[in-house]
């Protein structure tokens, strides 16, 4: 099947199509992850983006569904050097070709992904159109240029839950005194493994839609407000920002990735868009308090402006060892903390899982 990838700067790349026949539009972003394509494709944070892997062979262990981070593929399309046609793993039920076809998502292979990655690093993230069943480069570029920027879309509405629902904590897992604590999780496109990490520590969870007002959240009587990961521009998540403002100082507040940016905005800081983002499982992060380096899994295109933290009560706890961007903050006086990286991994290293989720348990009065 013919396929073409067109970028807004006029770049045209032809290759071989796989998955579904059709057109995908979005920002072209790259990840340096070697494995974890099941997790990445089903991560709601990739909504509105065409995902490209720098690693040359993707799909070699097939698709099992055990590691999905949501029920469906959220990336708009997939760009790879080679998509494995005959995967092997004892749990695999289908190939990545079949997976994309089943989900109605197009893919393109036979592409020089390293060249495209270098271009993204030099020129920044660009809009793109991936068309399968055609090799009309002029049309692909036209579609890419006419597609609205990701910051103009309300992507959160497409991935948040539609109504509140309760998830009891794992039985007998709570190590603190008294009954298990209750966290309200503002779902902006939450990954399944974040839920799993809170659940297995015995914390009762109520997931609420992104548009839930502070008064409604208060009705659930939470012991903790948790802000999830999600897609797009954090400044668009106004209801979540207002929720943090309402509960900061009254109960503990924590967040991951998109949630980290929202917490920082709510406290008075600023965010900005990175040139090409951080995506992959090999991002080095420094803990400025413990003076330690660890490797983290990341997926974000925005960051918190370190200079804007002055006067907010927040301080930088974690810093990216590559480009010195903010990777996590804590409040000087309140139980408010967040990280830009993904301590729950899936996929990626789990160096910081216990550090982050252990702190969640601790601020709720539990035992580590």
Curated annotation (Swiss-Prot):
Catalytic site positions: 257 (nucleophile), 342, 344
Pathway the protein takes part in: Amino-acid biosynthesis; L-arginine biosynthesis; carbamoyl phosphate from bicarbonate: step 1/1; Pyrimidine metabolism; UMP biosynthesis via de novo pathway; (S)-dihydroorotate from bicarbonate: step 1/3
HAMAP family (UniProt xref): CPSase_S_chain
Gene3D superfamilies found in the cross-reference section: 3.40.50.880, Carbamoyl-phosphate synthase small subunit, N-terminal domain
Any Gene Ontology CC annotation: carbamoyl-phosphate synthase complex
Glutamine amidotransferase type-1 domain location: 182-368
Keyword Secreted among UniProt keywords: no
Pfam families named among the record's database cross-references: CPSase_sm_chain, GATase
Annotated positions binding L-glutamine: 45, 230, 232, 258, 261, 299, 301-302
Sorted UniProt keywords: Amino-acid biosynthesis, Arginine biosynthesis, ATP-binding, Glutamine amidotransferase, Ligase, Nucleotide-binding, Pyrimidine biosynthesis
Gene: carA
Region CPSase, residue ranges: 1-178
InterPro entries per UniProt: Anth_synth/Amidotransfase, CarbamoylP_synth_ssu, CarbamoylP_synth_ssu_N, CarbP_synth_ssu_N_sf, Class_I_gatase-like, CPSase_GATase1, GATASE
Top-level taxon: Archaea
Organism: Methanosarcina acetivorans (strain ATCC 35395 / DSM 2834 / JCM 12185 / C2A)
GO molecular function terms listed in the Swiss-Prot or TrEMBL record: ATP binding; carbamoyl-phosphate synthase (glutamine-hydrolyzing) activity; glutaminase activity
Record's subunit section: Composed of two chains; the small (or glutamine) chain promotes the hydrolysis of glutamine to ammonia, which is used by the large (or ammonia) chain to synthesize carbamoyl phosphate. Tetramer of heterodimers (alpha,beta)4.
PANTHER family assigned: CARBAMOYL-PHOSPHATE SYNTHASE SMALL CHAIN, MULTIFUNCTIONAL TRYPTOPHAN BIOSYNTHESIS PROTEIN-RELATED
Reactions listed under catalytic activity: hydrogencarbonate + L-glutamine + 2 ATP + H2O = carbamoyl phosphate + L-glutamate + 2 ADP + phosphate + 2 H(+)
Reported function: Small subunit of the glutamine-dependent carbamoyl phosphate synthetase (CPSase). CPSase catalyzes the formation of carbamoyl phosphate from the ammonia moiety of glutamine, carbonate, and phosphate donated by ATP, constituting the first step of 2 biosynthetic pathways, one leading to arginine and/or urea and the other to pyrimidine nucleotides. The small subunit (glutamine amidotransferase) binds and cleaves glutamine to supply the large subunit with the substrate ammonia.
GO BP annotations, alphabetical order: 'de novo' pyrimidine nucleobase biosynthetic process; 'de novo' UMP biosynthetic process; glutamine metabolic process; L-arginine biosynthetic process
Uppermost EC category: ligase
Protein name, as recorded: Carbamoyl phosphate synthase small chain
E.C. numbers: 6.3.5.5
Amino-acid biosynthesis keyword on record: yes
Protein family according to the UniProt entry: Belongs to the CarA family.
